[in-house]
Amino acid sequence: MTNWKHFLDEEQDRFLSELIEFVKIPSVSASPDYIDDVKDAADWVAKRIIKAGGENVEVMQTGGHPCVYGDWLHAGSEKPTILIYGHFDVQPADPYDLWDTPPFDPVIRDEKVFGRGASDDKGGMLIPIISFEAIKETTGKLPVNVKFLFEGQEEIGSPELPDFIAKHRRKFSCDMIFSSDGLQWTEDEANLVTSLKGLVGAEIRVTGPTTDQHSGLHGGAIANPLMAISQLVASMKDEKGKITINGFYDDVLELTEEDRADIARVPYNEAEYIKELDVTELHGEEGYSTRERLCLLYTSDAADDTPCVDLGGRRII
């Protein structure tokens, strides 16, 4: 029987074609214009799990974008059950003029697939499906029981997922969850992430005049909402990067020496990191290394949710 490694090599062209086909589906979860496309992506995933040898495959409704479930539970009750998670929705692709090629017409360049979602997370979630297929196809079995759960709303914060999982907790019961949504440390070094930062979000709305007011006529007499929100956001951190939001640090655990030692053992090239981000310098709270700030330190950031601004001569408050 063919070795699973040989199987992967022999089927490489097929897997690549499948990824390109998958990326062509514009499954943007943030826009109602793409609801049907997200459903199409869910159907594609369900068919791919079946093709790989998965069983009990179904597209499940959540009240929002759907989830896809599948399993293979023949390793035996004494063997652990691993649930593999991923997502098939993608971020919006605009601004389109910054793309060298159409985001949903993927191309291969420099041995990489360029297209929206190729890495986050369509390529990532295909890997465990392909691995499952390779082992099952070449050995006829797996050493563990496997469940798949792929969702279509991760990029908007998975709003329906908690209640959905609670409702179907027996179906999703497992001994371990493996997330396919992540990054490899470097091209030559793999990594196993054991925890992730949590997230708390708040929306800030600043209102001003109900109609456009000319800055030349009314500037200096009324408050400018853009200036106000800029001042508000800037006040969230001091010049040393420390967060100034009242109560932010309450009950926050400090990094231990063991935490710092664990992070320090991980290979890291700061010059390469700066080059990769195309910035001139790094910034953050004093007293911590870049890796400590990235991996374990609490942060506060502002995410822009304002509409595009036409700067063609308009002077509006």
Q: Predicted segment positions?
A:
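Conserved small/polar residues in nucleotide/adenosyl-binding loops
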Residues: 298-305
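Long, low-complexity segments enriched in small/aliphatic residues
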Residues: 244-295
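Acidic/histidine-rich catalytic neighborhood of metal-dependent amide-processing enzymes
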Residues: 119-195
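A short core secondary-structure module
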Residues: 219-240
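Hydrophobic alpha-helical segments, chiefly the membrane-spanning helices
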Residues: 309-317
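Flexible glycine/proline-rich, aromatic-decorated loop/lid segments
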Residues: 193-207
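N-terminal helical capping/dimerization or prosegment-like subdomains
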Residues: 2-96
